[in-house]
UniProtKB/Swiss-Prot annotation:
Entry annotated with the keyword Membrane: no
Subcellular location: Plastid, Chloroplast
Classification via InterPro entries: Domain_X, Maturase_MatK, Maturase_MatK_N
Annotated GO CC locations: chloroplast
Main location as per UniProt: plastid
Name of the gene: matK
Entry similarity comment: Belongs to the intron maturase 2 family. MatK subfamily.
Positions of transmembrane segments: none
Name this polypeptide is given: Maturase K
Single GO MF descriptor: RNA binding
Alphabetical keyword list: Chloroplast, mRNA processing, Plastid, RNA-binding, tRNA processing
Length: 512
């Protein structure tokens, strides 16, 4: 970030809010590829006077590529003379890919600088570093969701028209040449497709340049959430103390204060419909959850609001079937690898008054998180640790490693999964995962030594795996003091860690 500031101040672009000249700076493309300026320009089929210019991403090369993008007639000429000019076909997409990679770096600069300045101004965010952990979301859900009645499971709709994305970025980028170039990249790269995520014919955009794709998608989501946050704050007469820090966790980065004044005029007449002080919103991947303590009628009003917002503000049809309204005791949802629900747990208490004794039955809702074993087995099968039935198999790709490396890899996978799923209310599924990985490790070692699993374990002993497949109880005994709760009782309680900043790869296979 300090490098960006230096480059901006050096070129005078920061004061003028011009991003377009940065596209001609060679260091931008070096940052995009995280490598030195050593890319051969002859790869792009350029003439000798350009390809010999330092054999790198040169400003002359980039200028010529952008000029070709603007000259629409040259595309038709190139198709008719494809044998002489290799700009058509995959080369055309390669040119767009190169420009879009640098473009992704450039458009992130004003947002990154604004984020740094907002973090310096807001001291309360710097004190909440633990909110970076994925597990920090679940204590919030445990505290809030057990007291709510209804929940809406919303699938964020797409595709979004490309022109809508450009209009969204106009609120943040006041550089018309940059926005015009973005339009050209959209319409030419997608071969006529006007939406993102694109259709199958142009789906490569999200794969070829995931950085720009994530930036555009997050811009669209932030626009939706900005309007929703404005409406929620305007309609709520009791503020939630946990909502402010949660904004940082969901990557709003303080952008809510920049909502346009037009929103006030558009929604002023409808605010009276949404008087609810207990509205909570959580977004994860392509879905979001909106929970409330209100009535079913109130949730239907919010559903109608979202459908009208997507139709009127983003100009595309959104099926009402994307929004499901459920009551919490009958609703479960996948969230970051966990199957979460709020079941009602019955309990009885004996009370005695004089000579009469009687039982008092009570029902208490409790937020629970469990491991969904069937998707997890499918993920392990995809990684070649077992078959689809959950039977462990050997890992032939690791048979060439040393014994210690093989055991260390299997043990590290289990420890990471055990660490990630430490918040599960029921640990039986975790023991099943441990069994699969341990036996898969034994089969891999037996395959390497051309022996059977039984003979291999008899020769080394079953204790050979213990130090690598250390159970969570043993880890907790090394961390927690002896005066804490008994380990058998503590192992049944969910434990949330504050050092998990990304989803486990095996979890990410099925959590879509």
């Amino acid at each position: 970030m300090e490098e960006f500031k230096g480059y901006l101040q050096k070129g005078g672009f920061k004061q003028q809010h011009f991003l377009y000249p940065l596209l001609f700076q060679e260091y931008i493309y070096a940052l995009a590829h995280d490598q030195g300026l050593n890319v051969n320009a002859s790869t792009f089929n350029e003439p000798p006077e350009i390809s010999g210019y330092g054999n790198k991403y040169s400003s002359l090369l980039v200028k010529r590529l952008i000029t070709r993008i603007y000259q629409q007639n040259s595309f038709i000429y190139s198709v008719n003379n494809s044998k002489q000019n290799r700009f058509v076909g995959h080369n055309k997409n390669f040119y767009y890919k190169m420009i879009s990679e640098g473009f992704a770096i450039v458009v992130e600069i004003p947002f990154s600088l604004r984020l740094v300045s907002s973090l310096k101004e807001k001291k309360e965010i710097t004190k909440s570093q633990n909110l970076r952990s994925i597990h920090s979301l679940f204590p919030f859900l445990e505290d809030k969701f057990s007291h709510l009645n209804y929940v809406s499971d919303i699938l964020i709709p797409y595709p979004v028209h490309l022109e809508i994305l450009v209009q969204i970025l106009q609120c943040w980028i006041q550089d018309l040449p940059t926005l015009h170039l973005l339009r050209l990249i959209f319409h030419d790269y997608h071969n006529g497709s006007n939406s993102i995520p694109p259709n199958k014919s142009s789906f490569g955009f999200s794969k070829d340049n995931p950085r720009l794709y994530r930036f555009l998608y997050n811009s669209y989501v932030v626009e939706c959430e900005s309007i929703f946050d404005f409406l929620r704050k305007s309609s709520s007469y009791l503020r939630s103390t946990s909502f402010g820090p949660l904004l940082e966790r969901t990557h709003f980065y303080g952008k809510m204060k920049h909502i346009g004044v037009t929103c006030c005029n558009d929604f002023q007449k409808t605010l009276w419909l949404f008087k609810d002080p207990f509205m909570h919103y959580v977004r994860y991947q392509g879905k979001c959850i909106m929970a409330s303590k209100g009535t079913h009628l109130l949730m239907k009003k919010w559903k109608s609001y979202f459908v009208n917002l997507w139709q009127c503000h983003f100009h595309f049809w959104s099926q009402p079937s994307r929004i499901h309204i459920n009551q919490f005791p009958h609703f479960s949802f996948y969230l970051l690898g966990y199957l979460s629900s709020v079941p009602i747990n019955p309990s009885s208490a004996k009370s005695q008054m004089l000579e009469n004794s009687f039982l008092i039955d009570s029902f208490t809702p409790k937020f629970e998180t469990m491991i969904s074993i069937i998707p997890m087995i499918g993920s392990l099968a995809k990684a070649k640790f077992c078959n689809l039935s959950g039977n462990p198999i050997s890992k032939p790709a690791w048979a060439d490693l040393s014994d210690s490396d093989i055991i260390d890899r299997f043990g590290r996978i289990y420890r990471n999964l055990s660490h990630y799923y430490s918040g599960s209310s029921k640990k039986q599924s975790l023991y099943r995962i441990k069994y699969i990985l341990r036996l898969s490790c034994a089969r891999t070692l037996a395959r390497k030594h051309k022996s059977t699993v039984r003979a291999f374990l008899q020769r080394l002993g079953s204790e050979f795996f213990e130090e690598f497949f250390m159970e969570q109880e043993k880890v907790l005994s090394l961390i927690l003091p002896r005066t804490s709760y008994p380990l058998h009782q503590l192992s049944r309680e969910p434990i949330w860690y504050l050092d998990i900043i990304r989803i486990n790869d095996l979890v990410n296979h099925f959590d879509l």
